[in-house]
Structure formats: C-alpha cells, structure tokens
A protein has these predicted regions:
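Phosphate- and other anionic-substrate recognition elements at nucleic-acid/protein interfaces
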Residues: 2-7, 11-149
C-alpha cells in the first residue's frame, strides 16, 4: 500500500497524519514536539519506519490573501529538512482554514464521546489529516518551492 504523511508544522508541536491514496483518507497519528525549530527526529524516524510513506505533504501557512507569512518560513525550513533527511518527495500545500476544520472535527468527536478534553493536543494531528486529505483528493494545490529529492 502506498501511503503519504501529512504535517501541520507549528512552533511547539508538529501534527502528523498518515493517508491512504486509494481511499483518499487520512488520520492523525501523532503530535511531535518541536523545540526551537528542532523536531523530535527520533519520534519522526520511528513513525517513518513503521509506516514507510512515499510522499511527505507539509502545510504552508498563508494569509487569507494567499501571501506567505512569518510562520511560512518555519514550514519551508521543515519541508527542506524532511527532504534532506528522508530523500522523499516533499510537497508544500496551502493550509488555510485547516485548523478551523480540525477544531470542528475534534468538537464533533468530543460530543460523540470519542475524544476527551485532555486529548486537545491531537488537534494538531487532526489538522495534519485535513491538510493531507486536501492533497489526496486534489482539493489543494502544491505551492511553488516544494522540495524534491
């Protein structure tokens, strides 16, 4: 099975999701600590070894006007690090509105009794799933400057 990873890059946490190309679905699997711009590479390495993704999709934070913002630089740097470390194609995609969709999904899961308030950290993983699903279904376009091995 070919799968892809999606990432929601943040200054403190990086949400990670895994997606299936056949079903165009994704699910959050982790929220990785990010300290001073340095991700927990050991945890990321373990996830990669367990899932063996063939493509990495990183959300690129943009303003509502579609312009890059200060957070875009961190996401681009992270995408470049992923490309160098894993020698896999890395795609940058527009992540506007993904956090709101992730929060909506999390609230629905809480209302259904599937999530607890203390699971709130998983919103980052859910945001990564939203980013990845958008790419898998072709709803989000790759942004210029995507890294490739």
């Amino acid at each position: 099975m070919s799968c892809a990873f999606g990432f929601d890059y943040g200054s403190r946490l990086i949400g990670v999701a895994v997606g299936n190309r056949l079903t165009a679905s994704a699910r959050g699997i982790a929220a990785i600590p990010n300290r001073d711009g340095t991700p927990d590479w050991i945890q990321l390495d373990n996830l990669r070894q367990n899932w063996l993704p063939d493509t990495l999709v990183v959300g690129l934070p943009l303003t509502l006007d579609g312009e890059e913002q200060p957070a875009s630089r961190g996401a681009r740097r992270f995408a470049s690090q992923l490309s160098e470390r894993y020698n896999l194609p890395v795609v940058l995609v527009d992540e506007r509105h993904t956090s709101q969709e992730a929060a909506r999904r999390f609230a629905q899961a809480r209302a259904a009794g599937l999530k607890r308030k203390r699971d709130v950290q998983q919103i980052d993983a859910e945001a990564a799933a939203v980013i990845l699903e958008g790419w898998l279904t072709g709803m989000t376009e790759a942004m210029p400057g995507a890294a490739a091995p």
